[in-house]
């Protein structure tokens, strides 16, 4: 709030609960545990809050500036002495109509390691204070995606290449940009193309790179929440790369997906 002004209430999502025990009881049988020795925690937690004063319209949709973070116990050694806690924090633009996050690389911290709450506060403040929303530049970049059309034939080529990429030798994969998703997510992109009420194909119209971004963002929503941020940023980078290739400005190998 000190950086961005008034925020909406924090929204949280947790993964499945883990029934555990306190460290001093780790060698007991489950049947021998007293109630005060049992613990319950959620392996992963994600939270977001929206900046009330930064809402824009992009391609007919409301877009909010959003901050948030992820904490995953799966990255920590819970039964050892105190070690650094691992967090991920981000700032990004969220498409309000379907909760898709259009995350750009200037607002993602990656993994940060902290020993105290003061460390967390300091590192989060460093990211938030250094973040420039680039409202015109970033949103202009996203809005411009609508100006690059993708025919059904071309969409099918991209989908086919996404499937093919997964089976290429590692040596070939290293030379190509990637969208880090599996078959299930690729299928979800196709489903979005066919039936998404907001971004799906409409009779007599071509889709655009903006639609492609929404299919990809929607597809990675089912990823574990501690992996979702990297995948979401990857979606944005991938579609921007596809657009450059379509406009003849490819420098990173995205033309492979169009051939």
Residue ranges and their predicted role:
Residues 5-259:
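Intrinsically disordered, low-complexity regions enriched in serine/threonine
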Residues 1-2:
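Charge-rich, low-complexity N-terminal segments
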């Amino acid at each position: 709030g000190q950086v961005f002004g008034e925020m909406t209430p924090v929204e949280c999502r947790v993964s499945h609960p883990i029934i555990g025990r306190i460290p001093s009881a780790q060698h007991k049988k489950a049947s021998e545990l007293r109630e005060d020795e049992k613990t319950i925690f959620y392996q992963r937690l994600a939270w977001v809050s929206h900046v009330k004063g930064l809402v824009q319209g992009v391609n007919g949709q409301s877009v909010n500036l959003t901050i948030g973070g992820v904490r995953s116990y799966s990255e920590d050694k819970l039964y050892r002495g105190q070690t650094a806690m691992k967090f991920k924090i981000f700032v990004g633009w969220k498409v309000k109509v379907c909760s898709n996050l259009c995350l750009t690389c200037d607002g993602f911290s990656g993994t940060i390691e902290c020993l105290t709450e003061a460390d967390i506060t300091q590192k989060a403040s460093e990211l938030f204070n250094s973040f420039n929303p680039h409202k015109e530049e970033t949103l202009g970049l996203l809005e411009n995606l609508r100006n690059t059309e993708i025919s059904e034939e071309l969409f099918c080529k991209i989908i086919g290449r996404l499937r093919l990429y997964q089976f290429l030798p590692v040596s070939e994969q290293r030379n190509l940009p990637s969208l880090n998703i599996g078959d299930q997510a690729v299928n979800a992109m196709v489903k979005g193309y066919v039936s998404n009420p907001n971004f799906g194909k409409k009779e007599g119209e071509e889709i655009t790179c903006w639609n492609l971004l929404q299919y990809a963002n929607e597809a990675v929503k089912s990823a574990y929440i501690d992996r979702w941020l990297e995948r979401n940023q990857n979606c944005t980078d991938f579609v921007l790369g596809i657009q450059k290739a379509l406009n003849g400005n490819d420098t990173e190998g995205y033309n492979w997906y169009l051939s």
